[in-house]
């Protein structure tokens, strides 16, 4: 792995942390993610992540507009889809929304792993 790839991955993962685990994820966004609706706050949450990805790619990879747009689009749509599906699944299986249940932690791990795979893919494509 090149130094550039390592730095880009670090920026992408720090951005993911900031988007999910700081005040950038508002109470309204978090509430909507619990049930998968309304979609607006989930889309806004995905947009926050997409902007952070765009900034990382522009800063570390290449400031090529089409590359940045592609990275932002991939992040927005995959983040929106993953969070929406997880919310809808939580309605059908209430344990997914309860930190006291082991299934909650399994689902959180799968969710975060899926988001990480998307970020690795974005880094790969950005540095091709």
Where are these regions (language model features)?
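Hydrophobic alpha-helical transmembrane segments
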Residues: 1-128
């Amino acid at each position: 792995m090149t130094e550039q790839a390592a730095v880009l991955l670090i920026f992408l993962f720090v951005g993911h942390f900031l988007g999910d685990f700081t005040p950038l994820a508002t109470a309204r966004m978090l509430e909507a993610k619990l049930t998968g609706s309304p979609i607006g706050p989930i889309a806004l949450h995905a947009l926050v992540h997409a902007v952070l990805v765009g900034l990382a790619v522009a800063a570390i990879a290449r400031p090529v507009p089409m590359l940045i747009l592609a990275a932002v689009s991939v992040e927005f749509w995959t983040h929106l889809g993953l969070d929406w599906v997880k919310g809808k699944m939580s309605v059908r299986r209430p344990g997914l929304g309860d930190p006291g249940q082991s299934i909650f932690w399994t689902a959180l791990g799968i969710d975060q792993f899926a988001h990480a795979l998307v970020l690795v893919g974005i880094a790969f494509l950005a540095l091709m």
